[in-house]
């Protein structure tokens, strides 16, 4: 194995030359297909269009869209000219959008109509009312002094905005020499992508990631699953998150394999795409795999083509991973990391025993150093002792954008990144994640780790998903609260849960509060927002007349 000094654009051009007619991007549900050479030509045309509206080296270009076909076109176009691609969570509401556009010093924002109950066009007009009266490309806003353009990704026309067809036409006026000049200045250690942390613990920060960070992390991720150019990866995770744009896209980019895209997660579209395209790998967060396995039409699709994949994004239940292996025929691997480590820090390998792949998160990525430290003393923990996971290597971010104080909080003087996650290293060098430092429940002086209780409750028949969080307690400081989603048609009482726990786990770990819910508070990338569970628990106690003691 090795690390490569190639940029995203160089990788794309490599495969466009080596395998020009091989399919690269496929949208099976709409039969839309791009070969490597076709996509590369469209990327060059888009890059020239962006140059025509003032995008150049160092310019920040935002993308606010689901996995639409031109999402990757715009990514590679920005990468080729040295611009920074800023990914925007599709679940963002007005204040979050405005915060990100201001904080990132965005120059050009690319949008679609919207998602779910959010009208992106109207929200953009609310943020930038000047669009309704200004000439396209001449936007001036006091609140957003860097913003010059809004691009609608599609054919529709909106006042004050370009659409992608117009961008491509404008590119006809840009000489190839100008594009080549900008391409020649791009270095693999330049920032290419800025992702805002998903907000599981607080307000987002802009993580600056380089070509070198993300292409090499994607490459090594694929190596762990023995990817080759013959593989077909079904990508149904959002591209605005590292899981989609790095672990999926950069894996395919560096291995020359086919990426079968799903625009927005729909378990039926995922199953149909795997069946039709004969996908060999599938990625997803736990909630996605749950939805696929429990879909009423699951048995109609042939999953035997699958051989591997990744379940990540949040703590992965062992029982769920067993079901995926048995019913979807794939050897599940896991990747642990965070946006700040681009994102993989540790990973299991396809040849690892089931216990390692499903109960642990493997060992260090090649060319990195991972250690477990005592969060209070900073000393490295012995094997088998829990501590904070820390990482140093090629995958470490450049820092948080315009936030040196926050950067200094997580990057120490030896350039180790402190994750805030708790883990244990075993004698074979494999790691197990036990929770987050901030998620730990302290009940009357006893440290309780939610992951342990969650894994236990998953074994209770009828439980589809479960999360555990601390609920404020006058007597103990915190009490254990369990939030349970039941399988369809299952009825359960609080007493059933407590009876299941009794004499099997310590009494102080048995949930004091048990809530049956339909969903968990989530980020747009599928991560559960633990910090909001506490507020939800207090709200449910109030609604149900439960006294907090």
Map each language-model feature to its residues.
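AMP-dependent adenylate-forming
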Residues: 11-35, 157-158
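Conserved pre-ATP/AMP-binding loop-to-beta segment of ANL
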Residues: 20-23, 143-147, 151-158, 162-196, ...
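Conserved AMP-binding/adenylate-forming core of the ANL superfamily
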Residues: 24-76, 93-98, 163-172, 185-186, ...
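Conserved AMP-binding A3 loop
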Residues: 33-37, 183-185, 192-216
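Structural core segment of the AMP-binding/adenylate-forming
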Residues: 81-169, 488-490
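AMP-binding/adenylate-forming catalytic core of the ANL superfamily
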Residues: 92-102, 109-111, 282, 393, ...
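Gly/Ser/Thr-rich phosphate-binding loop
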Residues: 168-169, 276-284, 293-356, 369
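Conserved AMP-binding/adenylation subdomain of ANL enzymes
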Residues: 215-232, 240-281, 289-291, 295-297
């Amino acid at each position: 194995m090795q690390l490569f000094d190639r940029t995203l654009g160089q990788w794309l051009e490599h495969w466009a030359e080596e395998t020009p007619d091989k399919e690269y991007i496929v949208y099976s549900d709409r039969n839309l297909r791009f070969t490597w050479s076709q996509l590369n030509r469209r990327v060059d045309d888009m890059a020239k269009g962006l140059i025509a509206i003032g995008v150049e080296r160092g310019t920040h270009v935002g993308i606010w869209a689901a996995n639409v076909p031109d999402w990757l076109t715009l990514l590679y176009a920005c990468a080729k000219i040295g611009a920074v691609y800023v990914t925007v969570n599709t679940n963002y509401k007005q204040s979050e959008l405005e915060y990100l556009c201001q904080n990132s010093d965005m120059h050009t924002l690319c949008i679609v109509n919207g998602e779910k109950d959010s009208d992106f066009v109207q929200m953009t007009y609310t943020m930038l009312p000047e669009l309704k009266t200004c000439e396209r490309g001449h936007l001036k806003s006091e609140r957003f002094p860097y913003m010059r353009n809004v691009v609608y990704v599609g054919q529709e026309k909106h006042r004050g905005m370009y659409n992608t067809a117009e961008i491509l036409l404008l590119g006809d006026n840009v000489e190839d020499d100008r594009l080549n000049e900008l391409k020649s200045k791009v270095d693999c250690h330049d920032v290419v992508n800025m992702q805002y942390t998903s907000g599981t613990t607080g307000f987002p920060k802009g993580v600056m990631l380089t070509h070198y960070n993300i292409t090499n992390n994607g490459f090594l991720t694929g190596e762990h699953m023995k990817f080759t150019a013959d593989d077909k990866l079904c990508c149904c995770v959002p591209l605005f998150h590292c899981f989609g744009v790095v672990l999926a896209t950069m894996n395919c980019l560096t291995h020359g394999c086919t990426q079968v895209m799903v625009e927005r997660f729909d378990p039926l579209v995922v199953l149909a795409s795997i069946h039709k395209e004969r996908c060999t790998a599938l990625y997803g967060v736990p909630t996605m795999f749950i939805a696929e396995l429990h879909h009423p039409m699951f048995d109609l699709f042939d999953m035997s083509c699958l051989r591997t994949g990744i379940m990540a994004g949040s703590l992965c239940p062992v029982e769920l991973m067993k079901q995926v292996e048995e019913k979807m025929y794939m050897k599940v691997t896991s990747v642990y990391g965070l946006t700040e480590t681009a994102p993989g820090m540790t990973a299991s390998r396809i040849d690892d025993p089931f216990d390692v792949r499903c109960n642990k998160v493997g060992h260090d990525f090649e060319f990195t150093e991972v250690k477990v430290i005592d969060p209070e003393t900073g000393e490295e923990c012995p094997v088998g002792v829990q501590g904070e996971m820390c990482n140093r290597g090629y995958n470490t971010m450049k820092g948080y954008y315009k936030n040196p104080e926050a950067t200094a909080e997580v990057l120490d003087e030896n350039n180790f990144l402190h994750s805030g996650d708790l883990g244990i290293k075993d004698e074979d060098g494999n790691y197990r994640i036990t929770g987050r430092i901030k998620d730990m429940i302290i009940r009357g002086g006893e440290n309780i780790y939610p992951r342990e209780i969650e894994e236990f409750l998953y074994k209770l028949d009828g439980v589809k998903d479960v999360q555990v969080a601390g609920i404020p307690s006058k007597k103990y400081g915190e009490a254990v609260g369990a939030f349970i989603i039941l399988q369809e048609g299952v009825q359960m009482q609080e007493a059933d849960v407590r009876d299941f726990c009794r004499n099997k786990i310590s009494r102080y770990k048995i949930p004091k509060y048990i809530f049956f819910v339909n969903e968990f508070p989530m980020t747009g990338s599928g991560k559960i927002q633990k910090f909001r569970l506490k507020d939800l628990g207090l709200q449910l106690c109030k609604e149900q007349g439960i006294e907090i003691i």
